[in-house]
């Protein structure tokens, strides 16, 4: 494993859904929820 260098949309979306939000943007290693 290690630091993510590219965002995985499916992983980002799942993480956002866990906190009751949806994926806003997914760039580089940053997942933004909204």
UniProtKB/Swiss-Prot annotation:
Record carries keyword Disulfide bond: yes
Alphabetized UniProt keyword annotations: Disulfide bond, Ion channel impairing toxin, Neurotoxin, Potassium channel impairing toxin, Secreted, Toxin, Voltage-gated potassium channel impairing toxin
Keyword Ribosomal protein in record: no
Expressing tissues: Expressed by the venom gland.
Disulfide bonds: 7-26, 12-31, 16-33
Family: Belongs to the short scorpion toxin superfamily. Potassium channel inhibitor family. Alpha-KTx 18 subfamily.
Function recorded in the entry: Reversibly blocks Shaker B potassium channels.
This protein's name: Potassium channel toxin alpha-KTx 18.2
